[in-house]
Curated annotation (Swiss-Prot):
<dbReference type="GO" id="GO:0005524">
    <property type="term" value="F:ATP binding"/>
</dbReference>
<protein>
    <recommendedName>
        <fullName>ATP synthase gamma chain</fullName>
    </recommendedName>
</protein>
<dbReference type="Pfam" id="PF00231">
    <property type="entry name" value="ATP-synt"/>
</dbReference>
<keyword id="KW-0472">Membrane</keyword>
<dbReference type="InterPro" id="IPR023632">
    <property type="entry name" value="ATP_synth_F1_gsu_CS"/>
</dbReference>
<dbReference type="InterPro" id="IPR035968">
    <property type="entry name" value="ATP_synth_F1_ATPase_gsu"/>
</dbReference>
<comment type="function">
    <text>Produces ATP from ADP in the presence of a proton gradient across the membrane. The gamma chain is believed to be important in regulating ATPase activity and the flow of protons through the CF(0) complex.</text>
</comment>
<keyword id="KW-0406">Ion transport</keyword>
<keyword id="KW-1003">Cell membrane</keyword>
<keyword id="KW-0375">Hydrogen ion transport</keyword>
<dbReference type="GO" id="GO:0005886">
    <property type="term" value="C:plasma membrane"/>
</dbReference>
<keyword id="KW-0997">Cell inner membrane</keyword>
<comment type="similarity">
    <text>Belongs to the ATPase gamma chain family.</text>
</comment>
<keyword id="KW-0139">CF(1)</keyword>
<dbReference type="InterPro" id="IPR000131">
    <property type="entry name" value="ATP_synth_F1_gsu"/>
</dbReference>
<comment type="subunit">
    <text>F-type ATPases have 2 components, CF(1) - the catalytic core - and CF(0) - the membrane proton channel. CF(1) has five subunits: alpha(3), beta(3), gamma(1), delta(1), epsilon(1). CF(0) has three main subunits: a, b and c.</text>
</comment>
<keyword id="KW-0066">ATP synthesis</keyword>
Length: 291
């Protein structure tokens, strides 16, 4: 019954793995609910900042703020690449990286260079492994990242845009659609689109003018930064919700696969045990007949 003992050892090993994946599935389910709530709570702030900024930009067209410049010749682009810090979340990071690398290659074919800010260790490791130009990064952000952890890398990129060292900035992340579906997204963060500050932007539900201190332009310049930061944080929240959803689904699949493997191993064990018993009975019968 040496074979039977080996099968039992495999069954116990798979059962232990199944317990781990089941626990990870439950943890991911809990974390996903929390990240979804954080994502929902961040939206009203971002929307209010966008609305006030849009109103100010439309009433102060000669603002001269570099972050609001809309037409530039593209010579160098920046990317804010958001991925997870941990794995075991299916093809989430692979799909985002595939979309990101395709865009990088497209720019390189046009002779346009890139500068990358990585938020999340998986994206950072991928970029470093293929020799991309990473200018700043933030990793080990945890389950509840603080905006202060992102300010350094983001400020670096925004300042380079203000100095005309970068002409366009893309935001790349995994967007949360629902529990079963997450999609890689790439958005133009800078220059800010017409749908945010142009004539096509939603109009505020009022017609009166505020008095701004110290000046409307100073407030506008401040709000532009806050708006950009809120968009990035919203994308990070989306990515974290996507990560937990993808990990929950992946761990459920792993748990189910472990259950199927255990059933198959038990079937093999029972068959081998049945064969061994049949052999022993045959030997006993043969021995009795010989006597």
């Amino acid at each position: 019954m040496a074979v039977g003992k080996e099968i039992l050892t495999k069954i116990r090993s798979v059962q232990n793995t199944q317990k781990i994946t089941k626990a990870m599935q439950m943890v991911s389910t809990s974390k996903m609910r929390k990240t979804q709530e954080r994502m929902r709570l961040a939206r009203p702030y971002a929307e209010k900042v966008r609305m006030v900024m849009s109103h100010l930009a439309q009433t102060n067209t000669d603002h001269g703020i570099p972050l609001l410049e809309s037409h530039r010749e593209i010579r160098r682009v920046g990317f804010i690449l958001i991925t997870s810090d941990k794995g075991l979340c299916g093809g989430l990071n692979a799909n985002v990286l595939k979309k990101f690398l395709a865009q990088v290659q497209e720019y390189r074919n046009q002779g346009i260079e890139e500068e990358i800010v990585c938020l999340g260790s998986k994206g950072l490791m991928a970029c470093q492994s293929i020799g991309l130009n990473v200018v700043a990064s933030a990793v080990n952000l945890g389950d509840t990242p603080k905006m202060e952890m992102l300010l350094g890398p983001l400020t670096e990129l925004f300042q380079r845009y203000e100095k005309h060292e970068i002409d366009k900035i893309h935001l790349v992340y995994s967007g949360f659609v629902n529990t079963m579906r997450q999609e890689p997204r790439m958005e133009v963060l800078l220059p800010i689109g017409e749908n945010v500050i142009g004539d096509s932007a939603p109009k505020p539900p009022f017609s009166w003018e505020y008095r701004y201190e110290p000046t409307a332009l100073a407030v506008l310049e401040y709000l532009v930064r806050r708006y950009l930061e809120s968009v990035v944080y919203q994308a990070l929240s989306d990515n974290m919700a996507s990560e937990q959803a993808a990990r929950m689904v992946a761990m459920k699949a792993a748990t189910d696969n472990a259950g199927n493997a255990i059933k198959e191993l038990r079937l093999v064990y029972n068959k081998s045990r049945q064969a061994a018993i049949t052999t022993e009975l045959s030997e006993i019968v043969a021995g009795a007949a010989a006597v």
